[in-house]
């Protein structure tokens, strides 16, 4: 259960006595987080055992990571085709998305991720997720075809993540159901090492 910060009272005590407890649990999912202004209170986070993204996600990559993985200021000039096709042109930029049907984007992302994974061999989870911004997804003919078949741009995203999950089966990939990817796809299903973070705003 999640409660607001105001729903509990913490009374400071000098001594706390607890009975002997032996309790083991296997969580239904590996990472649990809720995000609100209450998270700024460290006691609240501790009480509800909310995890810090930096403790779980490689290089603290937990949301809106497209531009961290393939920065547009590094790749955009030479490879504008990596980025969203909108109103007749590819538009690299900090908030641009990727053209997820372009195999060169997949290859470039694999190279970047492989380097990140090698630098952090003891960590398993990373987010590969859209940049912040609505209606910025790629509308090239290939992406539009997948979007129409899947009934949502989330289909393109899950297909891309599934390919990454197959390429790196020992890693876990997180992504977002957020804004234009909020609705689930009709056909494709995420692989076991792909998890979806619901971000309903």
What are these regions (language model features)?
Residues 187-193:
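Short, surface-exposed basic-aromatic patches at helix termini and helix-loop junctions that form
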Residues 1-159, 163-170, 174-177, 193-199:
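Feature activates predominantly on carbohydrate-active enzymes
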Residues 178-187:
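Alpha-helical scaffolding within the catalytic cores
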